């Protein structure tokens, strides 16, 4: 699948980066905004991360490895979804990068997903990530 197309999404959240970070790394909060995913990880560099659930009527168990952690600033991991229909080999993994930036007490949360095989695939992924970030924003802002 190796591709050069980048998917991206961003949202400004009315909360400090520390609260947004908690939402990115707390399995209970992740379940609330990530389509009901059950997440297993300690979110330490080199650790495995697994996402299990159901999306659009299909069960999935996605997985990857945490590549880089800068608390309250950056979370980067690999990601593979068997629902892609691709073989589970490194060249079919995406790298997902969350970047948090303090903007006057709020947080600009940006997400990028690399290795999309086409412009259409990148656009579809961007739309899904945008939906997820909007849900994350609602979870964080409602937990004041």
Q: What is the predicted role of each segment?
A:
Residues 1-38:
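Hydrophobic ligand-binding cavity/cleft-lining segments
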Residues 35, 54, 80, 112:
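Surface loops and adjacent helix of pleckstrin homology
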Residues 25-26, 71, 141-142:
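Residues at helix-coil transition
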Residues 108, 114-144:
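A conserved amphipathic terminal alpha-helix motif
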Residues 20-21, 30, 49-51, 66, ...:
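Hydrophobic pocket/interface hotspot
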Residues 4-10, 48, 61, 74, ...:
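Intrinsic-disorder/low-complexity, polar/charged segments enriched in Ser/Thr/Lys/Arg/Asp/Glu/Gln
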Residues 39-42, 59-104, 114:
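Hydrophobic-ligand binding "helix-grip"
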């Amino acid at each position: 699948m190796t591709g050069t197309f980048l998917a991206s999404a961003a949202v400004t959240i009315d909360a400090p980066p520390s609260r947004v970070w908690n939402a990115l790394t707390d399995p209970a909060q992740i379940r609330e905004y990530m389509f009901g995913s059950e997440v297993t990880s300690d979110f330490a560099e080199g650790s495995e991360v697994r996402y299990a659930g159901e999306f659009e009527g299909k069960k999935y168990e996605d997985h990857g490895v945490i590549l880089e952690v800068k608390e309250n600033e950056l979370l980067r991991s690999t990601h593979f979804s068997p629902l892609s229909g691709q073989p589970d080999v490194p060249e079919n993994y995406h790298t997902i990068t969350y970047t948090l930036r303090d903007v006057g007490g709020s947080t600009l949360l940006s997400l990028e997903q690399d290795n999309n095989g086409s412009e259409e695939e990148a656009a579809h992924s961007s739309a899904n990530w945008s939906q997820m970030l909007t849900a994350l924003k609602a979870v964080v802002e409602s937990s004041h």
